[in-house]
Amino acid sequence: MNVKNRKCIRRLSLKSLYANRRRNLIAIFAIALTTLLFTSMFTIVLSLNASYETYQFRQVGGYAHGTFKDVSPEQAERISAHPKVKAAGARKVIGITAEGVFAKVPAEISYMDANCTKWSYATPTTGRMPESGKEVAMDTAALQLLGVTPKLGADVTVSYSITDKDQTAFTVTDTFTLVGYWDYDELMPVHYINISRDYADDIEAQAVKTGLQPFRTDLNVMLASGTNIQGQMEQVDTDLGYTWDSYTDPNSVRIGVNWGYTSSQLESHLDPELVIAIAAFLLLVIFTGYLIIYNIFQISVAGDIRFYGLLKTIGTTPRQLKRIIRQQALLLCLIGIPAGLLLGYGIGAVLVPVVLRSTQLDTGITTISTSPVIFVGSVLFALLTVLLSCSKPGKMAAKVSPVEATKYTDAMQTKKKQRSTRGAKLHQMAFANLGRNKQKTVLVVVSLALSVTLFNALCAFVGGFSMEKYVSSMTCADFIVSTPDYFRYNPADEFITPEQIEEIAANTKASLSGTGYAVRKPAYLWMTEDALRQDYARYESAEQLDSHMSRLEHRGNMVMGKTRIEALDNSLFDKLQVLDGDISPMLEPDNNAIAIAVSLDDYGNLPNPEYYPKVGDTITATYADDVKYIDSRTGELRTEDTPEEYFQAKLYGARDVEYTVCALVELPNSMSYRYSGVGYDAVLSADTTQRDSGGAVIPMLYLFDTADEADEAEAEQYLSKLTAGEFSPLMYESKATARSEFAQFRQMFLLVGGILCAIIGLVGLLNFFNAMMTGILSRRREFAVLQAVGMTNRQLKTMLIYEGLFYAMSSVAAAFILSLAVGPLAGKMLGSMFWFFEYRFTILPVLLTIPVFLLLGWLIPCMMYDNAAKCSVVEQLRDAQ
C-alpha cells in the first residue's frame, strides 16, 4: 500500500525542529564548523598552490602550459588548430646580450605576439607592444641599466649577439624607439626586450645571407587543462604525425612542459607513499567532520527518543523516522553550510598572506584562489559527512520500540547489575557513567586524542627537518664566490681571477679555503661502450644511438667519452665524500691518481654502481689542444651540407695520460661545474691537472669556511658590498642564505600544520562539550531523582567533573598509544617524501597537553552544570517527562 504522506512527514520534521531551537543552534554550529574546516582547508591549500605556481611561473618566465620548440610556420598553424590547444602564442628569439650591464641578468631580444607577451608577464603597462620598424618595449630595470629614462618615444641603443638555432654569431648595435614599458620583476630569469615582427624578419634575412641558420620560432600553448601537460602535448604531436624525441628529424616537434605547474611536478613524482599520504589526509578530514556532527545528532535522537517512540505507536514506519531525521539534517545544512562557506573562505583568505609572509614566496605573488573546487568540494564533503553522521542515529530511532523509548536514559546496559555494600563513591559513579554508552565515550576520547596525536605528529614532523642535511645539499661551504657565468651554468673563457681571490682572502678570515679549477682544453676519458650507451640512451633512439657509436673513436671495447675534469686545491679534498677507496694518493706529489665523481640520489644511495669503473682500475684520459668535426666520408672538415650522421670528431695535439682510480667520491654540486652531461665526472689535484693538461687550468670558484659566527657575519657583510650592483663582476652564495630559506620553509609548515591542529583541536573540544551536554540533557530525569533522594548539587557537579577528568586523561592515554603506533610509520613515509627529514621520536607534546586537558576537564563540566541546574528539582522532573 502506497500512502502519500510525504507532506505530513515534512511538517513533522519542521515542527519538531522548531521545538528544539537551542539544540538546533548547536547543530547548525557543528555543521558550519565542519564546512568551515573543509572550506578553509581547500582555500588555504589551493591558494598556497596558486601562489606557489605564480612564484614558479615568474622564475620560469611565463605561465603557458608548454612549448612546441623550433616549429615551422606550417607546423605552428596545424598545432594551433588542434582541438586540445585552446590558444597559442609565437616567439622568435633573434639575439641575446649577457655582458656589461646585463652580466648578472641577461636580456633576450625577441618578437612575441599578443598571447606570448601576456603569458610572459611582458605586457606594457605604459604604451603598447612594438608593431613595426625599430620599435621596442622592455622593463624599467633594463632601461635603467641602459641609462634611459622610461619615457615613450625615447631612443634606446642596444648591442646584442645574433643567435640562430645552432650558434651565437656576430654583434649588432641598433637604436630603437621606446613604445612601451613595464615594471621589472626581480624573479624573472631574463630581461625581455621585445621588438616588432618586421625588425625580426629583417635581421633574420641578413643573418641567413651570412650563412647562419633561420632563427628558431617556439610556439607556447595553453591547453584544455593544466593536468597531464606532457601527455596532452605528446598526443597533439601524435595526432599530427610528429615525433618529439629527436633533434635532427625534420618531422620531430620537441616539447617542453612548464614545470611551474604543480600538477606536472606531481605527475612526475607520484609514488605510493604520496598517494597514501593524500588519501590518509582526506580520510582524516572527513572523519574529523564526522566526529563533530555525529554526536550532535546522537544528542538530538537521545533527547527526542520518547517522541520517536510515540510516533511509532501511531503507525510511523522506521523508513519514515529515518526520513524525518535526514530532512532535519538537510534543513540545518541550508543554514550551516552557507555560513561555513563564508567563514571558511574568509579565514583561508586571511591566513594565506600570513603564511606566505613567513616564506621566501612573499614577493607580491599572494593569490587567493577562487576555484569552484573550494566551494563545490566543501559542500559535497559537508553533505556527505552530515548524511553519514545522521545515518546511525536514524537507524537507532527507527529500531527503538515505544516501551524502550520511555525507559531510555542514554545507557547501553548489557552486564548484570551487582549489589555493593560499600556505598556509592563519586569517582566510581563517574567511571561507571562513562561505560553506559561506550560508543559515545570512545568517539569523544578518539576525537580529543586525534587532535593531540596530530599536534605530536606536527612537532615530530617539523622537528625532523634536518637543517644540516638541507644546508649541506644547498652549499658545501660558508661562502662560494665566482662570476655570474658560473652560477648560471654558462661555459666561459674566464671565471674568477687569481687577483680577485687574493683580494677576498685578504679581507676575510677563513678557517678553510681553496680554489676549484676548470680545464679549458678538450678532455676525454675512455670508458666502456656499454657505459656510454647508458648516457646517450636518455637522449637518442636506438637507431640514432647505433649511428652515434659508430662515429666515435674506439680502442677495443673502450670508447672515447666526453668528461668534466675538475681540479681542486689540496685543502678542498676534505669536502669530498668518499664512497669507496682512498683519496690520499691524490695528495702525493707527482701522483697519477684520479677520483671518479658519482651521482647519488636524494637519500645518499648510488643507483647504478655498475656504470662506474672500480677502484684500482686504470683509466685513460686524452687531452687535446683543439677539436674539429670532419666528414667521415671524405676526411675533410664538415660543411653546412654535411648530414649529422657523418660528423666525426678529430683531435689536434692529442696526448694520453693513464690514471689509477683511487676512489669513488661524491663531489658537492655547489663546488662542481653545476651541470652534467654524458661521460664521467672526475676530480684531480690542481698540480696534477696543471701538469697533464699543459697548463690549461683556470680558477672557476673560490670557497671558504669561517671559524665562528662573528667571522661569518663580517665575511657576509664584505661580500655583500663587493658584489653589490649590476656592474660587479662577482656573485656569491652563502650558508646564511640557505639557513634563511630553510627557516622560512619550516615556518610555513608550522603555520599550516598549527592551523590544522587548532581546527581539529576545536573539533575535539566541541565533542567534549557535546559529550558533557549529552550526559546532562539525556540524564536530567536521573539527576532530578538523585537530588530528590538526597544528592546535593555539589556532589552532582563533582561527579561530572570526575567524568570530565576521566575523558581528559583517557584522551591523553589514547594519544600516547596512537603516537607510539603511528609515529614510526608516519616518520618512515615522511622520510621517503622529504629527503632532508630525519624522524626523531618525541612524546613531549603529549605530556604538555596534560595540564590543558585537566583544566578543561574541570572547567567545562562546572560551567555546563551550573547553567543546567538553575531549575528546581520539581521543574527538572516535570521537564524530564
Annotate each predicted stretch with a short phrase.
Residues Y18, R23-L46, A280, F287:
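Hydrophobic alpha-helical transmembrane signal-anchor segments
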Residues T34-T35, L283-Y290, L384-T385, A758-F768, ...:
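Hydrophobic transmembrane alpha-helices
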Residues M1-I26, G303-Q320, I347-V376, L384-L448, ...:
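Feature of multi-pass inner-membrane transport and sensor proteins
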Residues L48, L270, L341-G377, S391, ...:
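Short helix-loop junctions at transmembrane helix boundaries
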Residues N20, L291-L332, G764-Y807:
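Interfacial "coupling" helices/loops that link adjacent transmembrane helices in transporter permeases
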Residues I325-L342, V379, T414-R419, L800-A814:
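Selective transmembrane-helix segments that form parts of the transport pathway or gating/packing helices
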Residues L46-Q265, G463, Y470-G753:
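Basic-flanked hydrophobic alpha-helices used for secretion and membrane insertion
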